[in-house]
Amino acid sequence: MANILVIQVQGYLMENALPLVTVLIPIVGSILVGLLGLKDVRLSRAVAVIISAFTVYLTAEMFLAALNGYTLFYNLPALAGIAMSMKVDLTGSVFALFTAFIWFLAVLASLPYMAHDQRQVRYFTFLILTLGGCVGVFLCGDFLSLFLFFELMTLAAYALVVHTQSTDAMKAGANYLYLGIIGGLSLLSGIILLNSYTGTVLIEPLMQNLQNTGGAAVLIAILMIAGFGVKAGMVPLHIWLPQAHPVAPAPASALLSGIMIKTGAYGIIRIVTMLYTPSNELAESGLWHFTENIGHVIIWIGIITMLLAALMAVLQNNAKRLLAYSSISQMGYILMGVGAAGYLGYDGAMGFGGFTYHIINHAFFKSGFFILFGIIYTRLHEVNMDKLGGLWRKFPVTFAAFAVCAAGIMGIPGFNGYASKTLLHHAIVEAFEHHHLWDLWAAEKLFMLTSGLTVCYIAKLFISIFFGKLKPETEVKLGRKGQNENFIERVVAIMFIGIIAFLGLAPGAMVSRIIVPMTAPFTYNDYYVNYLLKTSVWNIHDLLGIAIALALGVGFYIFFKRKELFSYSLPDYVSVEYSVYNPAVKILGIAFTRVGRYIDESANRVYHGAPGILARTSVGVGFLDEKTFNLYGRRLVLFCAQAFEGLYSLWIATINRMFERAGKYLRTLFMTMFKFDYETRGDRRFQTFNISNIDFDLFIVLIVIGAILATSLLFIFN
């Protein structure tokens, strides 16, 4: 198919419509999935599988082209005078490929998971639509088109978060949307400023354009990193993740955790390691100072994120909530690697190798965790780990795959997490040796501490679910049959085992054939790229490092178990939501109330001031009447006064009716949107494909996003 779509080849730059086709197929296909579901649910499910599988094929085509040295591009129609394009280098194609493949596995896992769900057509519709937005993020050549796909993904995924429509799901969905709006507006503001100061929004090295912008360069970096940081789960912008994961269906949680948060990381990568770097021609210049400062900050954001989230994961009893905090912690590892790459600047290839490898690894073992736990959840409908246990005999293939995922995230040698965590450890050590700053020495120690905490909370999760005595209520739910997995679930589990084992046993092949070629469009010193290529993780020093982390983890587990600290509940005031977001919402509420009160009082002054104006006018007319006008003049004035009084009364009555009607319409609109929550009705179409149940929050989002896009793109960009 790729050969058919080739339009022109110029050296290693290939103009090709394949990126656009790859995105349009799931976006348009989602409509087909929804329409078919009105007639035949099974056909709708089958089409969803076919679309996701075909997307894997298309992304594989782009990956092979990029692996052979080609960069695919396709120019999109300009938006408000801003050129947009799709551009696929090896980095984007790798992200798109593992995204599409894991999405395909999640769609397969969704077949048995959603088999008896009345809203499964809506679920598969938005699942495929979100796939289009997510893949589109990785195939863009500029930040504006990336933003549009980013927002499409955000809005479509909302339906996955609130799918169960429980009280907790709706609350989690509201927080997800509100933070998504804030992140989107922050990102858009940064893009607007970037275009204003550089004249372009292309994803390419622009440090030479940004160096003389003063504080604008700092502001652009803050706005764009914060915008992507919301989706990446960066502390303190992470609070939607622990709320969304427990309430979403397990396959959707796998995608939220394993894939969608990678879109945020991808955006930060493109900012820190590309946008804020000089081009290759200026690589030896002194333009790296700003990049180094950004990298230093990102290192510590990553360290804080990984450590705090790991501590929170240790204290969770809800398995899905534990995995949510685990995802935040692992994103901290990735952010630390991005920061190390930025801090090292031209010599940052090791950081690039570490965070890239860990992004791929985390996508597989974390998606595996959620999908595998979903197999158990469909039988038991239980997420409290205290009520689970002894399940390894009932779910043998799930148990084996879960063990492989656990070994991967712990960093046990021979599994995928070991290689990427070792490269990340090398990167933070190199960052310390770059300038020998004491805080980076401390960062390396906290890295090791967090690795130990990771071992601790994963051991808690694994042991609580699969070992111990089988609970009586569990045995009643499962019955006496030996195994509870169906064929599709076993196939998905075995695929996770094979991929994680391959990524762990062949790190040299991954680095030499995938990771190192991915550095080509980035500005890195060839010496350090070759150093990354020759780095071996199978040496006594690195093995000793992971042994220390494993020993710390075992020690933490024994300590927490004996002291009965695994169920310890932290006080509310240490919560970011309690101590930061709730006060911020209250302050904003007070501010908006005062502004509204001022507007209302001003309107009242105008409203009540009109009679005073009329009275003063009457006095003036009376004076003229006595001194100047004759009898006919007085009659004329009296007629005018009566006409004015009549018009005034009519105006007052009209205003009152307008206020009454506006209030009535607003109340009706609010109550209608408020009642949009799903209620079972006799009409099967309403049950199957009721999009309106996304409640008042989506209405707000659509209005805000539409208004912002319309005003900013049509006026600011012109």
Descriptions of predicted regions:
Residues 2-6, 72-80, 202, 206-208, ...:
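Membrane-interfacial helical/loop segments at transmembrane boundaries in membrane proteins
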Residues 2-20, 31-125, 200-208, 281-284, ...:
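Transmembrane helix-loop-helix hairpins at membrane boundaries of multipass inner-membrane proteins
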